[in-house]
Amino acid sequence: HDVSNPALANLDFMGTPPGDGTTVLPTEANPAYSYFHVERTWSEFMSSAYGQQGGAATNPEFQAQGATDIAWAAKCQDCHMRDVVGVACNKNGVPIRPDESTEHPDSGQPLHDLTGGNAWISHILASTDPNGPVYDPVNAQLLDQGPAVLTLDLNAGQTPKANGAALLAGSDRAKQQLRLAATIQNLAYSGGNVTFQLQNNSAHKLISGFPEGRRMFGNIQAKDAAGKIIYEVNPYDDTIGTLKGLPHSHSSPALGANEDYVDELVYEVHPSSSLTGEAETFHFVLATGRYKDNRIPPKGFDLARATPRISEPVWHGTSDPGYFSTQE
């Protein structure tokens, strides 16, 4: 889906209710993809080869890495609700798809798991189940303080404290999706230099979705004969939980000797805001543009389609359609 900020789009019409019959608000006259970028997963897909009429073949590497049954994709569900053998409901006489189905002889039963790429939160919630496979008493104590302390109430509804196995299974499926999403190709070493290509196997940008809390980075390590790291690009501090050497970050640890931060190998979005005067901002709700968007586009990415949808690459505050080559 595409998500945009209607409050900013309608800023010049403060106090005008939508649908009042006299004033047509910008959000009523224009598609959501045309103003104030928040998420653009749908636009990324529609600008890819997979979003064109009939879809496209998936990458051989995608299939080889575990998606052997997904050779073609033309809609989001082909990967996120993949076809399996099964029935559509638990009633008697329901045909098993696809073999027993006359209405859908060419497609299986879509698996309704809607797996994405967020493996972390499901795993953390799974760890609150005392009878589950990954119980962690520290996590359980922190998260089970009740709604008076936290907005989270682990004792309401379908509590994760009784569903650890199911939550862990969902986390594992998300990790599988992440493994399918990318392939490192053409890795070569020459004269102390390393070159490689990172291929996007998904039908949207790598990474996609809500950009404020998501990034992907390339980590390169050089080791001596004993296996000791002697040089590292984009080192990650597991204790703090972030990359080292991040500019403008108070929580990012300083780089050590023989360590480098390479921004081009950190694939992410940095919003900008003309309202706050920040070239790069954490005030996501006030974001009016993008300072950085170097996320890897999907196969067949059409800039003529992507640019009006505000999903073209951006580098240092400037729209940069040529950031990736035509071949890339």
PLM regions: where:
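Primarily the internal scaffold of c-type cytochrome electron-transfer domains
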Residues: 2-328
